[in-house]
């Protein structure tokens, strides 16, 4: 019975709290900000490698066959 009463009181408390009254909002904003930076860094790293591979492919054109 104590568990049920505690659970109900906690549920009511959670439902009555406004979203801006806790620290979770700033936590999620900071997490999203960090996620954007990490994603951008990963994409830049991936595309940087990709561009170097494309440069090599242009330099060594497989369609040109030269016999020496």
From Swiss-Prot:
Disulfide bonds: none
Tissue and organ expression note: Goblet cells.
Pfam family membership, one: Antimicrobial12
Record keywords: Antibiotic, Antimicrobial, Lipid-binding, Membrane, Secreted, Signal
Cell compartments where the protein resides: Secreted; Membrane
A GO CC annotation given for this chain: membrane
Signal peptide start and end residues: 1-22
An annotated Gene Ontology molecular function: lipid binding
Membrane topology listed for this record: Peripheral membrane protein
Entry-linked InterPro entries: Antimicrobial12
Propeptide: 48-68
The keyword Membrane belongs to this UniProt entry's keyword annotation: yes
Protein task: Antimicrobial peptide with potent activity against Gram-positive and Gram-negative bacteria. Activity against E.coli and B.subtilis. Weaker activity against L.mucor, s.marcescens and P.aeruginosa. May play a role in innate host defense.
Something else known: The peptide is disordered in aqueous solution.
Similarity-based family: Belongs to the pleurocidin family.
Protein name: Pleurocidin
Species of provenance: Pseudopleuronectes americanus
